[in-house]
Amino acid sequence: MPNSIIKKYPSKGKLFYVIGASGVGKDSLLHYARQRLANESLVFAHRYITRPVELKGENHIQLTKEEFNNRLQRGCFKFNWHSHELDYGIGVEVDRWLMQGSNVVINGSRGYLNTAVALHPGLVPVLIQVDSNLLHERLIKRGRETLEQIEKRIQRAQAFVGLTSPNMQIIENNSELSVAGEQLVSLLRNQAVKIL
């Protein structure tokens, strides 16, 4: 599948690229931060995914495979990747928000990190981590995957142990949601470009 058509725009805002293994609590942490930072100069971008929308979990825009490919061919995605038999995209609207001075938070992919950094060198990677035993427990509890799929996700998580990138920020999510949630809120507030 071809990569998205990329146009580089001057960025006044900062791009935060939140990543972590399935089950580390990214969706919960992003939801927590979105509520706490609702009145600040941060925009939480939605993802376009070839997965049905669920009542609990990520608030994304569901696309069929055909719709996704159509948007990909038309250059509608700033970032796009394929993982766990699904296609994911971040829309080019993110560039407009950044150009207008908004700070933008996106739910990214560890496997796409190097490409994202190459396309947007100033982005801030935020890695959410959790102990491996807790990760397995959370994947079972959320009930979204089969046991075989859970095992594949655990193996993929192990493949990314030691992931590094310039300016990488790390948040451990091994206790109450509010602990890691407040760390994420503080990080976003402190590193966001202040709009005068």
UniProtKB/Swiss-Prot annotation:
The keyword tRNA-binding does not apply. Pathway: Metabolic intermediate biosynthesis; 5-phospho-alpha-D-ribose 1-diphosphate biosynthesis; 5-phospho-alpha-D-ribose 1-diphosphate from D-ribose 5-phosphate (route II): step 3/3. SMART domains: GuKc (SM00072). It comes from the Bacteria. Keywords: ATP-binding, Nucleotide-binding, Transferase. It catalyses: alpha-D-ribose 1,5-bisphosphate + ATP = 5-phospho-alpha-D-ribose 1-diphosphate + ADP. GO terms for molecular function: ATP binding; ribose 1,5-bisphosphate phosphokinase activity. One of its GO terms (biological process) is 5-phosphoribose 1-diphosphate biosynthetic process. The keyword Nuclease does not apply. Its EC number is 2.7.4.23. Belongs to the ribose 1,5-bisphosphokinase family. HAMAP family: PhnN. Catalyzes the phosphorylation of ribose 1,5-bisphosphate to 5-phospho-D-ribosyl alpha-1-diphosphate (PRPP). This is Ribose 1,5-bisphosphate phosphokinase PhnN. It comes from Psychromonas ingrahamii (strain DSM 17664 / CCUG 51855 / 37).
